[in-house]
């Protein structure tokens, strides 16, 4: 049975499943759908075509599904889809998609979005990610699974961050980050590998292989793209080569890499 505060304002067109808790002074619009076990603390606002998955918990003064902050948006149909078991903390803002993007913003399962996180239109966030306080994502950003982003970090539109990456706090990131890398700075560049996350997800032999692979990729000569092509040709059946090198070759913004930065950090870790 759902538990709904008397002061909540809920559209009769909204869909509320069983076991949902809605706190005082929440506002829920026409196109909102809340799956089983969703919990809204007081003063949460949900608008637009917004779907919230099972057991997701949203804290006070979060605003989800309101009109994108994009001057090109003209009221077209778009969605915000959030998966299961997410924690969305105080004052987060998450916008739906736009006609100029994929028409939806997507967030996976088991993520933690800390206070004051902003997720702009057409972003795609995987599962098991942590976005610390004050992280700001511009539009059209793609984030893979198991990514950690430190507080007060700003990320440029259309940037892609692959699986298992770590973005240090107070960074400004304008380029793509391939799998399992750590980046830091303004502008942020790759400093080394996210070995903590790799040890959680991979076997030791695979970590060693990826370490050597990045050493080959990040040599001064040939270029990063040429190195990625060569690796794919020579190790086409290796899943890590395919994952990492394909990501590099598909990058439209370029990779956040400087040879001097990566080399110095890796030497410290070794």
UniProtKB/Swiss-Prot annotation:
Any matching Pfam family: Hexapep
One annotated GO biological process: lipid A biosynthetic process
UniProt xrefs under InterPro entries: Acetyltransf_C, Acetyltransf_C_sf, Hexapep, Lipid_A_LpxA, Trimer_LpxA-like_sf
Compartmental location: Cytoplasm
Keyword line: Acyltransferase, Cytoplasm, Lipid A biosynthesis, Lipid biosynthesis, Lipid metabolism, Repeat, Transferase
Entry's Gene Ontology molecular function annotations: acyl-[acyl-carrier-protein]-UDP-N-acetylglucosamine O-acyltransferase activity
Reactions listed under catalytic activity: a (3R)-hydroxyacyl-[ACP] + UDP-N-acetyl-alpha-D-glucosamine = a UDP-3-O-[(3R)-3-hydroxyacyl]-N-acetyl-alpha-D-glucosamine + holo-[ACP]
EC numbers on record: 2.3.1.129
Principal EC category: transferase
Keyword Iron: no
Pathway of action: Glycolipid biosynthesis; lipid IV(A) biosynthesis; lipid IV(A) from (3R)-3-hydroxytetradecanoyl-[acyl-carrier-protein] and UDP-N-acetyl-alpha-D-glucosamine: step 1/6
SUPFAM superfamilies: Trimeric LpxA-like enzymes
Source domain of life: Bacteria
Assembly information from the UniProt record: Homotrimer.
HAMAP family: LpxA
Family of this protein: Belongs to the transferase hexapeptide repeat family. LpxA subfamily.
Protein name: Acyl-[acyl-carrier-protein]--UDP-N-acetylglucosamine O-acyltransferase
């Amino acid at each position: 049975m759902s538990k709904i505060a008397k002061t909540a304002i809920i559209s009769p067109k909204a869909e509320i499943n069983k076991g949902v808790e809605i706190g005082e002074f929440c506002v829920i619009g026409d196109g909102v759908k809340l799956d089983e076990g969703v919990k809204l603390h007081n003063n949460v606002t949900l608008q637009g075509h917004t779907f919230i998955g099972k057991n997701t918990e949203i804290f006070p003064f979060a605003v989800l599904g309101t009109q994108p902050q994009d001057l090109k948006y003209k009221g077209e149909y778009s969605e915000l889809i959030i998966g299961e078991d997410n924690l969305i903390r105080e004052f987060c803002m998450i916008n739906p998609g736009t006609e100029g993007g994929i028409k939806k913003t997507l967030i996976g399962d088991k993520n933690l979005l800390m206070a004051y996180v902003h997720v702009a239109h057409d972003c795609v966030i995987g599962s098991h990610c942590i976005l610390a306080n004050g992280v700001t994502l511009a539009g059209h950003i793609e984030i893979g699974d198991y990514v950690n982003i430190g507080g007060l970090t700003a990320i440029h539109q259309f940037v892609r961050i692959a699986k298992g990456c770590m973005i240090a706090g107070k960074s400004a990131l304008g380029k793509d980050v391939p799998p399992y890398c750590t980046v830091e700075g303004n502008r942020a560049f790759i400093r080394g590998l996210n070995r903590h996350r790799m040890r959680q997800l991979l076997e030791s032999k695979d970590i060693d292989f990826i370490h050597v692979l990045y050493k080959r990729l990040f040599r001064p000569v040939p270029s990063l793209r040429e190195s990625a092509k060569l690796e794919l040709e020579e190790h086409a059946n290796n899943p890590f080569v395919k994952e990492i090198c394909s990501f590099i070759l598909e990058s439209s913004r370029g990779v956040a890499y400087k040879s001097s930065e990566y080399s110095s950090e890796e030497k410290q870790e070794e």
